[in-house]
Amino acid sequence: MMMLLKRLYSVLCVMALYCSAAFAQVNIWEGTVGHKSVEMTPFLAQGSGNTAIVVCPGGSYFWHDTTTEGYDVARWLQRNGISAFVLRYRTAMVPAFVTHFRYVVRGNRYPDPQDDLRRAITYIKARADEYGIDSRHIGAMGFSAGGHLVMSAAELFDKDVRPAFVAPIYPVVTMTESCVHKRSRRALLGDNRKNNRALRDSLSLERHVPADCPPVFLVNCMDDPIVDWHNSVLLDSALTAHHIPHKYIQYLTGGHGFGASDTKGTAECRQWKAEFLKWIKMLNL
């Protein structure tokens, strides 16, 4: 009887581990030149050969909403059999927002977030067996500025580290058009490069959709008060013009910043989670 109880306790401990972050935070740049400290937190689904998603919270490229657009998203994915990795990619941070010190020193800016996401995908692929993941089925999901980040990975990364699919949710897209989210542009480009036309163009994602772009799941709300919904329209038009497999959902209500919350936004916009799960099953990963 005692032996049975001990075994039951061990099983419960393992289950509890998988119901939270199955592994402690990891520094994806540890052991590399410069020893950059960029943390990623795994939330592993049970089993092996799972699909995985790198979750990139939003925050205007200045900061992160790690709760609603990070850990809550990861737990929801984990409950649905998808392993998730919340990436705290480098951002410009609050002091840069307040002081404009990046006119004098570099600070964090492009391509730092993209380098971090590229490194995260490489890191996960190298440990796919350990994490119980199919290395061919690693996607990326991002919110707001994080949506720009994951879509830039779909367009700009080499094929060996490109996500298998991406889900930009109420994303920042353009850096040039009138609907640009200026705060994100300033954070990503840097104070002394925010008016550089060539750089703006290179990071306006509606202009650079490749013919072999991975599948895209795109969501926005027409009452978004933060990122103009025309950003998503620009991306949808570009994906359609290039015949890229994608699903675009435009909700009338929901605003911005609802992430995977069961209470934020509206009942209408919260349907995106069920729609995403249907969509990812249709990909037959």
Model-based region annotation:
Residues 115-183, 200:
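Primarily recognizes the serine-hydrolase "nucleophile elbow" in alpha/beta-hydrolase
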Residues 50-58:
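Short beta-strand element of the alpha/beta-hydrolase
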Residues 24-48, 110-111:
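N-terminal cap/lid segment of alpha/beta-hydrolase-fold proteins
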Residues 212, 218-220, 224:
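Short beta-strand/loop motif that positions the catalytic acidic residue
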Residues 65-66, 85-135, 265-269:
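Catalytic nucleophile-loop/oxyanion-hole region of alpha/beta-hydrolase
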Residues 33-34, 38-41, 95-102, 233-285:
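C-terminal catalytic histidine-bearing segment of alpha/beta-hydrolase fold enzymes
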Residues 66-85:
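Short amphipathic alpha-helix adjacent to the substrate-entry channel of hydrolases
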Residues 31, 171-208, 268:
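Mobile cap/lid helix-loop segments that gate and shape the active-site cleft of serine hydrolases
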